[in-house]
């Protein structure tokens, strides 16, 4: 749950009465623990576990992707046979590490985030896992860096040559990211958006008291969800995993 534009320091104190540290929308803590203990944590690579535990102690650790979400991300990448990928919103790199581990030896992930300091926390784990060579980290705001990437691809004579993209960044810009990524990800490729249920606020009545940040992000996510549902350029599937994940497959 990263912002991608440097909003991280203010988020934790800007939430409404929402438990932003809760990594699941499941109503049963026991059921979520069962999922984690049965099929997720026993298969979590040691390097990912170590990074997750260190990030949990970070003052913004609640922004970290959940272990079951990271497992799903790795599975999607392998099922898609992805080789060239994009990640918008990195934080300490837990989901980035999951991506790098899932990619083939010659795979590459362009990772974009304005917060290099947080990325540096996770970089030693990428190196220890032997996958740092797969990561092309680009410090800066998501929209600007994606525009630069579009220009680079055009200069190299490549059009829509990425296989996969994962977005966990500033929610008000998700709709703009979608248009950029549709130009970067190939037909048949996938774009995955995180936090598409925003702690359940998307289903609350309009007059529900919310903090300014939660209202702004919830409105942005509802707008995204409506647009994705009506977008004829993609297949779309929304899952109630973690804080909501939406998987898009480009059709045209």
Swiss-Prot record:
Q: Which GO terms describe its cellular component?
A: nucleus
**Keyword set for this entry?**
Magnesium, Metal-binding, Methyltransferase, Nucleus, S-adenosyl-L-methionine, Transferase
Task: Determine the domain of life of the protein's source.
Answer: Eukaryota
Annotated cofactor note: Binds 1 divalent metal cation per subunit. Fully active with Mg(2+). Active at 80% with Mn(2+) or Co(2+) ions. Active at less than 10% with Ca(2+) or Zn(2+) ions.
Q: Which residues participate in S-adenosyl-L-methionine binding? A: 65, 87, 89-90, 95, 113, 170
Report the main location listed first in the record. nucleus
Name the reaction it catalyses.
tricetin + 2 S-adenosyl-L-methionine = 3',5'-di-O-methyltricetin + 2 S-adenosyl-L-homocysteine + 2 H(+)
State one molecular function term (GO).
O-methyltransferase activity
Cofactor(s) of this protein: Mg(2+); Mn(2+); Co(2+)
Tissue-by-tissue expression: Ubiquitous. Highest expression in stems and roots.
| Cellular location(s) | Nucleus
Pfam families membership: Methyltransf_3
An example GO BP is: methylation
What SUPFAM superfamilies does the record point to? S-adenosyl-L-methionine-dependent methyltransferases
InterPro entries given in the database record: Cation-dep_OMT (IPR050362), SAM-dependent_MTases_sf (IPR029063), SAM_O-MeTrfase (IPR002935)
Q: What is its EC number?
A: 2.1.1.175
**What effect is documented for mutating residue 168 to L?**
Total loss of activity
Q: Which family does it belong to?
A: Belongs to the class I-like SAM-binding methyltransferase superfamily. Cation-dependent O-methyltransferase family. CCoAMT subfamily.
Q: What's the protein here called?
A: Tricin synthase 1
Q: Which organism is it from?
A: Oryza sativa subsp. japonica
Q: Which gene encodes it?
A: ROMT-15
